[in-house]
A protein has these predicted regions:
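Short, membrane-interfacial amphipathic segments enriched in basic
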Residues: 1-6, 386
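Hydrophobic alpha-helical transmembrane segments of multi-pass inner-membrane transport and secretion
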Residues: 16-43, 251-287, 310-319, 363-367
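Hydrophobic, regular-secondary-structure patches
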Residues: 31-118, 137-139, 144, 200, ...
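Mechanotransmission and gating elements of multispan inner-membrane complexes involved in transport
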Residues: 87-88, 107-114, 140, 156-259
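Transmembrane alpha-helical interface segments in multi-pass membrane proteins
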Residues: 278, 283-332, 356-368, 372
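Short juxtamembrane loops and helix-capping segments at transmembrane helix boundaries
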Residues: 327-354
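Short cytosolic juxtamembrane segments of multi-pass membrane proteins
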Residues: 375-387
């Protein structure tokens, strides 16, 4: 025979202060876990949604990053343009974009220091190959001019990043003529400028990377293999989504520190839950004995107290999730461990994050509640009745 759930709810309501304090402890732990998971989900979304399965990114052989690459020759780009399986635009131009990557230093808003920002130099074809990126204010840079467009995140997070301001690159100042939105992809952390003008300023005849659009998935794989095998090219080809997925190692420090903090807080929350349940057992000794006398078994009492602990943990989970809701979608940034420039992304409280938070809270409820529940189910009836 099972003890009614209403019995547990009534007892939690009778001890309001202790219930609230314990639920708040669990809530803060859950909120911390949600924050860390939302950060990682946001970072994963920024990199995971970047790229097209038909795009193949070519780097110099031995490189795993555009910034560290360099050395892709113009001759290699011309060879790539004439390979079978390369898509063309409506003008009949091969969708092959040689690109250069530099890092510039910008001051954060509020005087909170400076940080590195990735600056990508490309041609109009490179823009055409990224349909998720579009201008929301001003215009794109003019080919052959020292002009740049900045992402909306850069515009919000940094000083001197408005239309009309200038960014110092190489031999001169590059006016900002537009603001673009990159639909939450990794390009949301970038500044874009004209490739040919950069080559003139720096007298560069090589590219950091080359982006190639294939006509179909089979051609994309063939182009990737051709780049890796052709000794003339000396390139390392990879599908664009795979490249950006590999960049999620930027979240490793967040995951490590967050896991340690969440674990320490979880231990504290488990002790708080155990303390609450032990207090309930001590306070309700005669009740427990009476339940045994009228026919409730030890497993029923164990189950009842475990349910009470789980209800308490679910209450804490709900409070913790509610505490984090105002931060959902908040823009933040971290350092890319590959390029050492800032990656801008938004906190994402996805359904998976919320479900994980609830499971985390339930685990705390089980760990914190089992020992008191076991103690309650094993109490001697006569000694409990004597009080």
């Amino acid at each position: 025979m099972a003890i009614p759930l209403s019995y547990n709810v009534r007892n939690l309501r009778l001890r309001k202060s202790l219930t609230i304090m314990t639920a708040l402890g669990i809530a803060l732990t859950v909120a911390t876990a949600v924050f860390i998971m939302a950060l990682l989900a946001g970072l994963g979304r920024a990199f995971g949604t970047t790229g097209d399965a038909l795009n193949v990114l070519m780097l110099r052989k031995g490189s795993d990053s555009e910034l560290a690459a360099g050395g892709v020759s113009r001759d290699a780009v011309e060879i790539l343009k004439n390979l079978p399986g390369v898509a063309k635009n409506s003008k009949g131009e091969p969708l092959v974009s040689g690109e250069d990557i530099l890092v510039v230093v910008l001051p954060r808003k509020g005087g909170t220091g400076e940080t590195n920002v990735t600056t990508r130099f490309l041609t109009p074809i490179g823009i055409e190959m990224r349909p998720k990126v579009h201008i929301i204010a001003g215009r794109w840079f003019t080919p052959g001019q020292r002009e740049v467009a900045v992402s909306s995140s850069i515009n919000r997070r940094f000083d001197h990043a408005n239309i009309g301001d200038t960014v110092h690159i190489g031999k001169g100042d590059w006016p900002i003529v537009g603001i673009f939105d990159a639909s939450g992809t990794a390009h949301q952390s970038e500044i874009w400028g004209d490739l040919n003008q950069l080559g003139t300023d720096f007298e560069r005849s090589i590219y950091s990377s080359v982006l190639v659009r294939a006509t179909d998935p089979a051609s994309a794989q063939a182009l990737k293999n051709r780049a890796n095998d052709d000794q003339r090219l000396e390139l390392n080809g990879m599908l664009e989504p795979d490249y950006y997925a590999s960049q999620t190692k930027s979240g490793a420090p967040i995951k490590i520190v967050g896991t340690i903090v969440a674990f320490i807080m979880a231990v504290g929350a488990c002790f708080a839950a155990a303390n609450t349940m032990y207090a309930a057992v001590a306070y309700r000794g005669r009740e427990i004995a009476t339940l045994r006398v009228i026919g409730f078994s030890r497993p029923s009492i164990l189950t009842s107290f475990m349910l009470e602990s789980l209800i308490l943990s679910l209450l804490g989970a709900a409070l913790g999730i509610l505490l984090m809701l105002p931060f959902n979608g908040m823009t933040t940034g971290t350092q890319n461990q590959v390029t050492f420039s800032e990656v801008v992304f938004s906190l994402q409280m996805t359904p998976a994050v919320i479900v994980s938070a609830i499971i985390f809270a339930l685990i705390m409820g089980v760990v914190g509640g089992f020992a008191p529940a076991w103690h309650a189910s094993r109490r001697d009836i006569l000694s409990a009745l004597r009080g």
